[in-house]
């Protein structure tokens, strides 16, 4: 009989299971398959706990960006509070909030536990209470019916391969010419002046012959005028 009573008492305080519903909001953009693959969501238990700590990863469930963490261990005891840390990251966006402290408090037998969320900051991931002023009190977020995570702006481009030696087009005199539109215009003009006679001779030989005859006649007239002045 005592064994049955002890078992009943243990069942009254044993951990129940609850779910935290969340949503990733990228509006006005639509969530694509790329966002599904490049967004990482993790929830783990912090604070005082017994046994194996809870840890889980979630993925976006639909194009609306909904995701959830299931089977969170909580207690029926009214004085029992369990804390979890939600970490959200993306390879394409800076998410806000990217760290959320989730508080699950039991309300007694037959009642759903109360879920609260607080915007956490870097360096406070393992503080198990939002009331610790280090360095400031955490801001409470709306957790019902779902916790919403949005984005600040697109993340900067990540250079996974960095060239140690730059080429001649990245540094040096040639790079300076290519970066300046005025220098480029001067170079193109000089090249055009050098190539123009050859192009004309190739595509219009008659015009080239006429130009040569005109220059030759001008030279003859010049020498003829010089000879008359000497005589």
Swiss-Prot record:
Pfam families assigned: SOP4
Residues in compartment: Cytoplasmic: 201-231
UniProt key word Cell division: no
Signal peptide coordinates: 1-16
InterPro entries: Sop4 (IPR031395)
Membrane topology: Single-pass type I membrane protein
UniProt GO cellular component terms: endoplasmic reticulum membrane
Record localization: Endoplasmic reticulum membrane
Swiss-Prot/TrEMBL GO biological process terms: protein transport
Glycosylation sites: 48, 79
Predominant localisation class: endoplasmic reticulum
Keyword terms, alphabetized: Endoplasmic reticulum, Glycoprotein, Membrane, Protein transport, Signal, Transmembrane, Transmembrane helix, Transport
TM stretches of this protein: 184-200
The keyword Magnesium belongs to this UniProt entry's keyword annotation: no
Lumenal side: 17-183
Superkingdom of the source species: Eukaryota
Recorded family membership: Belongs to the SOP4 family.
Role: Involved in the export of PMA1, possibly through the monitoring or assisting of PMA1 folding and acquisition of competence to enter vesicles.
Designated name of the protein: Protein SOP4
Organism: Eremothecium gossypii (strain ATCC 10895 / CBS 109.51 / FGSC 9923 / NRRL Y-1056) (Yeast)
């Amino acid at each position: 009989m005592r064994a049955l009573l002890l078992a009943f008492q243990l069942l009254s305080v044993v951990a129940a299971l609850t779910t935290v519903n969340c949503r990733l909001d990228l509006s006005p953009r639509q969530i694509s398959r790329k966002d599904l693959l490049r967004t990482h969501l993790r929830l783990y238990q912090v604070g005082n706990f017994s046994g194996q700590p809870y840890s889980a990863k979630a993925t976006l469930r639909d194009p609306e960006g909904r995701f959830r963490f299931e089977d969170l261990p909580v207690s029926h005891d009214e004085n029992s509070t369990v804390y979890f840390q939600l970490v959200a990251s993306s390879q394409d966006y800076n998410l806000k909030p990217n760290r959320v402290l989730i508080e699950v408090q039991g309300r007694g037998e037959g009642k759903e536990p109360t879920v609260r969320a607080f915007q956490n900051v870097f360096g406070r991931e393992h503080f198990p209470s939002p009331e610790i002023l280090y360095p400031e009190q955490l801001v409470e977020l709306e957790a019902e019916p779902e916790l919403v995570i949005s984005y600040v702006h697109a993340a900067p481009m990540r250079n996974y391969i960095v060239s140690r030696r730059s080429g001649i087009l990245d540094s040096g005199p040639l790079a300076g010419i290519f970066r300046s539109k005025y220098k480029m215009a001067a170079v193109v003009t000089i090249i055009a002046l050098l190539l123009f006679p050859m192009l004309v001779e190739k595509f219009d030989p008659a015009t080239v012959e006429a130009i040569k005859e005109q220059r030759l006649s001008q030279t003859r007239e010049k020498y003829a005028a010089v000879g008359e002045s000497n005589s």
